[in-house]
Amino acid sequence: MDQASTPRPRSTGVLLHPTALPGSPVCGSFGEPSRRWLRLLADHNIGVWQMLPLAPPDPTGSPYSSPSCFALNPWFLDAADLAAEQFISAEQLDGLPGAEAPSHGVDSLSFAQACERSAALSEALLQSWPDQSAERQQAFAQWCSEQTWLEDHVRFRVLHDQHQQAWWTWPQPLAQHQSAALERWARDHQDALQKERLTQWQLDRQWQQIRTLAADLGILLFGDLPFYVSADSADVWSHRSLFTIAADGRLSTQSGVPPDYFSETGQLWGSPVYRWWRHRLTRFSWWRKRIARQRQLMDLLRLDHFRALAMFWAVPGGDTTAEHGQWQPSPGASLLRKLRSDAGGALPLIAEDLGVITPDVEALRDGFALPGMKVLQFAFDGQSDNPYLPENIDGSRWVVYTGTHDNATTLGWWQ
């Protein structure tokens, strides 16, 4: 079907989300904690840093059900770096929530404290912005003009904070993303919108500095892309026609996986699925922009639930279990061809192909020369033909893990 990509050299990596890095109040950041971590990896000849999605989390703290496929999590903004560059003052830095707390060294993260600190830091950025140089203001304006996703994100964020409910419950002209109504509303919320823009710009600036350091140290940054999108997100709100969701938030079809050995009722994820025929009409424009944004942030990208690019399990919208869904085809090959063309060569994607994988999924993965995944914790069931045993792993196009974020730690597994 397609030419194989150039084999990647063998390397070793570590999977660790930036929230887990020590050295900042509340949680890890895109500042010195990430720089120190990269230097530690380089000192030990570790060439890949893999992480979970960097997107804003949902209310439970999960980045896999984010309110934005394009934005970055404000928790990661490093206040000390902003103060050192005089984007905020030393007094503002000292006054941030959590500033008096000891450096992150506990085994849990307070989501409420992380949100409180990031909100206060965003406010400090806004208050200090009029004092910034013309050069900085111009750089900010230029960046904003290049981010086609930004205005939908900042409007969604401010509206969500204002109404504290899902978008389909907002006043109808706003809920239906009507341009004239949004423009009128935006005129009364300029400061709040500007605060969100500044936050995303600074996050992007700090992460690009991390990218530069990683490249200088010879370390690849390896991100993670959830397949489906939260119903209550800027993406679905602003592109509702691309998803199986009605104006009142009801899903005509929802995502999940069918019953199997582990679950008699399957898994019901509850997010809308894609109206693939509409994506085809746009030549997959939204998907291509989504991947292009991730390529600005990462060198490699794991595509979660890769099997849904071949066939996906579609569950009726009103169902409470995944039992009565049906398999439906996806235009995965067409999408991957577009993405490969955009990339100008080999796709920087890793297929998450764990679980029950059928020949059509394997053919799609192999046809585009995408590496798959192997997990060593799955290997030792006493069966000599177990596909996860190292001696049974054929070829070199695999990412092999001891375990992933879905598994126990290796120590916990062993015990």
Language model: regions and residue ranges:
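Alpha-amylase-like alpha-glycosidases and glucanotransferases acting on alpha-linked glucans and related
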Residues: 4-10, 15-17, 23-26, 60-204, ...
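Conserved, well-ordered alpha-helix/loop/beta-strand core segments that scaffold catalytic motifs
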Residues: 41, 196-229
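Catalytic domains of carbohydrate-active enzymes, especially glycoside hydrolases
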Residues: 32-57, 293-300
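Outer-envelope exported proteins of Gram-negative bacteria
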Residues: 52, 220-222, 226, 300, ...
